Amino acid sequence: MTLQELRYLVALADHSHFGRAAQACHISQPTLSTQIRKLEEQLGVTLFERTNKSVHVTAAGREIVARARRILADTDAILDAGQRQSAPLAGHFRLGVIPTLGPYMLPWLVPALRREYPLLRLTVQEEVTSRLLESLTSHRLDAALVALPVSQAGLDSMALFDEPFWLAMPRGDKMAKGKAVTEEELHGQHLLLLTEGHCLRDQALAICGSLDAENAAEGDFRATSLETIRQMVATGMGRTLLPAMALGQPKDSAIVLRPLAGGLGRRIGLVWRHSYPGAGEIGLLAKLIASHLPRGVHRV
């Protein structure tokens, strides 16, 4: 049994499809199938239940896949520890980011990381918070950029910056005039929201403080991205809350933006496993982010 075979095993468990797993491993599908069958013969158990369209990890396979993840994570940690002795933030680093942050933060963060730490091999995973936390605890990620607070055993967090929300509405909307929007004005307002699972949706509903806002949004429109919602606002479908980094440049002339009174918004931070050996790397990443923050957000 080799480390490469364990990587094939984990890839197939993650993708639940021989073709996609083979592509991720940069090998042919027959080669992957042969390696998995060889591993099953060595272990004397069936690791995957195969169908015409997908594969599923068996009960026996789940424990073996979990152990394989830990072995691979420890192996990567050994390799990275050696590289860190000669250079900071070197080796493989797996970063997660929520979808309402990634499109607006990664375009400046990734180039900055490459300039400052050329030996870093960065892998980015964009997912909702619950899945990022699951990937952290299962050693598939090293750290994640999420909205705080996060309360989960075994995870540490560090606040980075506060990002205010803005009310976005079509030009001509009755709320389009004025300066900062108060909580009283927002209470019970109909907003266009993201689908369930996005933390920004929950934050918007908390600010509006009304089940009516949720019911109205569910009945009219649900989106999986802020950019889709922005376009719907521009066409006059309704209002939404946008984080500062998502306001867009140049500004859309069909959309009017008003800040929220009191700086209402979200706090963004890094989350990582308490047992993660590269705590110093987390600090370096946080420092780099703080030094490159765009206008409109406020360092904590």
Language-model segments: residues:
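Short beta-strand-centered segments that line the small-molecule binding cleft or hinge
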Residues: 85, 108-112, 116, 123, ...
